[in-house]
């Protein structure tokens, strides 16, 4: 096979891979949107409006290199505070640079007094967050104090991993499952006047046409985020304009192929260039937007390899010129000149000139994602890609289980208020009923919310019904559910498997020792009690074993058989669903098995014990964070 044929083969495989990957991401998009909506119901605090930003809501096709975690981006807007883009209002943005990118937020004495007595806002606009400006008769909002106050008042639960930096807008951290990038912000009352060229420069038949730009101008807000300009004397007092919402609209306007190729470009950039520490993905994203706007290319038919090579040339030119123009602000160069060194320039030039390196990077991606083998694979071996991709019949199960988990958790939190709990239940049932995937949750949710037993029993309804009865100490109902389905160890391919959720609210006297052991060990690992999902059939088998332990009528032989069956089934469970790693069905099941081992040893019950796989020994750094969108 010659080089041209090999490239065609690689392009065809990449196109099939991206289409399959993207279609699955779009399938679960509404599930994830509802997940976020439910979570926002829990964290809805009067002074804060929570926005999602970043690659997920931009609908980039997400592909993460190994060991690179996919974080979740939140923008926390302070409600009922709008900053004037110019003028002398009670609170206004005063640019400190000609391009309007950076500036300070100035507040009048009268407006300051009103903020500090407002019931919801006084905890954000504190004495320490406002200092008298020596250049004007006003107060300056102190960015770092503002950021900390907003995060504290938002109620967002996560562990901060870094101290806030004056040059960065976010307060990064991590939750039990994912990394978080949290950005407090304030809304501008209008787009800056420095955006007039962006509004008018679109061509009628271009991707970003003029009529679309006018709609974005009206519908998408511009925020101010706490970030200072390198080497500026005002650095610790500065905010900068953020166009994260218009950027989301740009991605919505892109042709599907280009949106998918953005994800591929991000993978290649992260894999090859992120360690150099020069340009960030933010710079590359704007270069890509400029490519789409300026270059006369048929974006609906460009090949993946050609797209990447074109981008590489654009990055090389940008580094040589020291120029990355802001996509929205006029005459605003955001090139990171302070990071420029000979070594970094040389590394970029060498890597971006080596097109074979990019090709090998793409082949490595396909090997990792599709073949799961370390052997050398040529492009010709990637034929029949679609047949290697898993069926999507049960693809959404993990995402539905995650959604069910957060719904149950928030419902448990609101149960203290009957009115709030009823309102929450009605809203969730309505939202779940509109999508073909989330509709699968309705029967189970009615079981939780209303106690409605479905007419047609399934593994899911039996397991969740048994769990609710079990946590109330009603073993008769549990045994009835178990006897109807526990003997069936296989489920039809088209069945949706919804895990049983275990949370900190289930730490009641009815919670047995093995389940409590699993929760305790995971809490030790993560510093908080995570929401745990048990495979429904595993839970039913567990209940049978618990019932046998309580009665002990049949001697040790029956107990030994049930424990052996539970252990054998746990080995067949997925280590990747509903999360990869320590919150997977398999890992949680192994922890329950360890809990049984501890119990049997302490009670001197003489039955065979089972060693579980070493990766659930929690001293190993195995995290459940999303590293890539799993096709395996």
Curated annotation (Swiss-Prot):
GO terms for biological process: innate immune response. It comes from the Eukaryota. Nucleotidyltransferase that catalyzes the formation of some cyclic nucleotide and plays a key role in innate immunity. Directly binds some unknown ligand, activating the nucleotidyltransferase activity, leading to synthesis of a second messenger that binds to and activates Sting, thereby triggering the immune response via activation of the NF-kappa-B transcription factor. InterPro entries: Mab-21_HhH/H2TH-like (IPR046906), MAB21L/cGLR (IPR024810). Mn(2+) binds at residue 295. It holds the Pfam family Mab-21_C. Its cofactor is Mg(2+); Mn(2+). The keyword Transcription does not apply. Keywords: Immunity, Innate immunity, Magnesium, Manganese, Metal-binding, Nucleotidyltransferase, Transferase. Belongs to the mab-21 family. This is Cyclic GMP-AMP synthase-like receptor 2. GO terms for molecular function: metal ion binding; nucleotidyltransferase activity. Mg(2+) binds at residues 71, 73, 181. Gene3D superfamilies: 1.10.1410.40. Coiled coil: none annotated. Its EC number is 2.7.7.-.
